UniProtKB/Swiss-Prot annotation:
It catalyses: (6S)-5,6,7,8-tetrahydrofolate + NADP(+) = 7,8-dihydrofolate + NADPH + H(+). This is Dihydrofolate reductase type 8. GO terms for biological process: dihydrofolate metabolic process; folic acid metabolic process; one-carbon metabolic process; response to antibiotic; response to methotrexate; tetrahydrofolate biosynthetic process. Confers high-level trimethoprim resistance. Belongs to the dihydrofolate reductase family. Pathway: Cofactor biosynthesis; tetrahydrofolate biosynthesis; 5,6,7,8-tetrahydrofolate from 7,8-dihydrofolate: step 1/1. It comes from Escherichia coli. It is an enzyme of class 1 (oxidoreductase). Key enzyme in folate metabolism. Catalyzes an essential reaction for de novo glycine and purine synthesis, and for DNA precursor synthesis. Keywords: Antibiotic resistance, Methotrexate resistance, NADP, One-carbon metabolism, Oxidoreductase, Plasmid, Trimethoprim resistance. It comes from the Bacteria.
Amino acid sequence: MIELHAILAATANGCIGKDNALPWPPLKGDLARFKKLTMGKVVIMGRKTYESLPVKLEGRTCIVMTRQALELPGVRDANGAIFVNNVSDAMRFAQEESVGDVAYVIGGAEIFKRLALMITQIELTFVKRLYEGDTYVDLAEMVKDYEQNGMEEHDLHTYFTYRKKELTE
């Protein structure tokens, strides 16, 4: 069975986006870390997150969860992204398309909520400066059943790894 990890950047107030983009300037090393962790993996996201990507995520299989009607689950677009309407189809295609044992949930807020019970690890880039946006997650709720398993401090941000408590005992 494939393991789901969430990867996201957020501020102390839970802000993760504004106008379908990150509300902060690029953080040194953050995109490289995202690429390193997700390269060769399946990434699961919502339609708005997919549409906000500035470029195709090369070397990764994208599964896009959407509320828009689909003729069949698993329809692919010109970039090869797989479109699905529900969690079970997302997980089925993640399992089928995966070349490893981990898939990453990359957003947005609604997708994190829908897959929360299945996520075993969270890779959080904590942005130290406060930003306002239009998309938020409840960080306290998100990590309440997790235990910090790693931390890497930087000037403008800190990387945290959280592992589901039942898996660390």
